[in-house]
């Protein structure tokens, strides 16, 4: 278990800014419009998940957030493409899906380079993880934490949790809130720098 900050990654400022613009535009749509993008039967693997719907493992109260999932854009494996749900197209925002796909692919490529560095550190072949992650079941989750107008009872923005993925890449947050539990059992702020 670990947490690091990375500089010189593949996600450029222009793409990051475009993603924030598109995602903000989506979350500013009415609840009625956003509800058209809730995909039943997929356990929130693609599309929109509304405010308060998801809760952390062991919690009964929904987190105070809403989010959108972009998933894998399968390349060169038609059988696998049939197994993954399609990404959801947002009709109201003409650039939303293209920007989401570009960001997804840049983050996935960044993750590949990080795993190659880990493989080298572990004295494995540099490309050891490549075959395990190619067309993997990755998710790009864009999260919106709406303003809280009154203090909620027992609810949290996002309850303490551990990620279940091989690695998790987080873009620098626009606000404070993310904390990481260190080996001494203390919660410390994870503050992202500009790059």
Predicted regions and their residues:
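Peripheral, non-catalytic segments flanking oxidoreductase cores
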Residues: 1-194
């Amino acid at each position: 278990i670990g947490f690091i900050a990375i500089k010189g990654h593949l996600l450029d400022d222009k793409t990051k800014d475009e993603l924030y613009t598109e995602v903000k535009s989506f979350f500013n749509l009415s609840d009625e419009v956003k509800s058209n993008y809730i995909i039943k039967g997929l356990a929130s693997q693609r599309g929109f998940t509304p405010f308060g719907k998801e809760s952390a493992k062991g919690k009964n109260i929904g987190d105070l957030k809403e989010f959108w999932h972009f998933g894998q854009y399968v390349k060169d494996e038609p059988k696998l493409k049939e197994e993954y749900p399609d990404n959801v197209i947002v009709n109201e925002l003409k650039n939303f899906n293209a920007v989401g796909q570009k960001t997804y692919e840049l983050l996935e490529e960044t993750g590949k380079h990080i795993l190659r560095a880990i493989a080298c550190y572990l004295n494995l072949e540099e490309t050891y993880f490549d075959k395990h992650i190619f067309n993997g079941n990755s998710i790009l989750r864009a999260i919106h934490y709406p303003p809280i107008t009154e203090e909620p009872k027992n609810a949290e923005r996002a309850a303490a949790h551990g990620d279940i993925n091989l690695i998790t890449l987080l873009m620098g947050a626009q606000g404070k809130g993310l904390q990481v539990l260190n080996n001494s059992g203390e919660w410390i702020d994870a503050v992202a720098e500009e790059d």
